[in-house]
Amino acid sequence: MDYKKLLGDIINAIPQPTASNNKRRTSAEVCYKIQQIAIKVSHPFQTFRDQRVYSYTGKYWVSIDDFDLKIFLREALGRMTNNMVEASQREVVEGLFKQFPYTVMGLAVEQNKEKINFLNGTIDLKTERLEQHLYSDYFRYVLPYPYNPSAMCPMFMKYLDRVLPDKDTQKVLAEYIGWIFTPLKLEKCLFLYGSGKNGKSVFVDIVEALLGKENISHESLSDMCGENGDRSRANLSGKLLNTCSDVAPNAFSGDIFKRIASGEPISTRQLYKDVATLTDYAKMIFCLNELPKTNDKSNGYFRRFLIVPFKVQIPKSEVDPKLAEKIISTELPGIMNWVLEGRERLITQSGFTESSLCQKQLEEYRYGSGVRKKVNLILPDGFKL
């Protein structure tokens, strides 16, 4: 969302100064006054656990870029004092910028996983009722279409039947996206695996549109689990999903990967800010032609892999370069209903549907094939080939 109009509305609500209210204020007093005006126009600010300042749009909480926040604070002070020269002084702006996150700091509240936020309201998944948007749900996203419980997605299902005919594996995909909207701890990363022209990139394009581009991050395994991974991991904050296409990921830290896959608290660091701990961050989908190389042969590493093989090669004569665009333009509400069915199934089963294709692919990744597989199956961890 372009939050600049929202910030402009707050500035416009600041009353013009008079002789009686134009006294010099401390940074804390200015920040407090700005927050009170923001609350009055229903756009309150709050600093979340990731140390970013957010503002409520009326539908969800949006993160304010540091530079834009500085401009806003300068403009707000200039409006309060009718003195833009003083409001533009570096030490004044920096003082407000440092103070403001503390003024609007609130209790760390996680997003409500029993509800999903749509353009036309919030669906309570327990009661199946569509409710009005509330700031107290602390959503940091809104899905970019209305909730429609009767919507269908025939074009999407036809595509899925063509590229991934196995019904159990289709269920796994729906359940994984549905998992985003649950508090379940399932400890999985989804890997879409296979060589080109097999439809997996179309699936990723559709899922990104389904969740909203602004709710997606694009961090690679090697970046998140590498030497400076704390900066890369900071970009997962407030996102629903992280997607990335690594052609051939190099060996990476298995320990950090396991923490991310498990949804455990992870350390992050934004540039020029203190280390923060994330507890609510994106789920993972990686679209790969080759599976990651690893020195970690433990069960704890491999059990976090959910590998969906895309093995159907689509002939050039059948390739429709605009297929994802066609599906996205008409079927997102219906696809979300497919996801909600997967979510319900996931909760009922307390886990993902068993897919023989996924299991076979995981075994091949872990143990290899042929003679190598037979040998690895009898070797203990730490001695596998």
Model-derived features: positions:
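Trp- and S/T/G-rich repeat-edge/linker motifs of beta-rich repeat architectures
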Residues: 53-56, 60-75
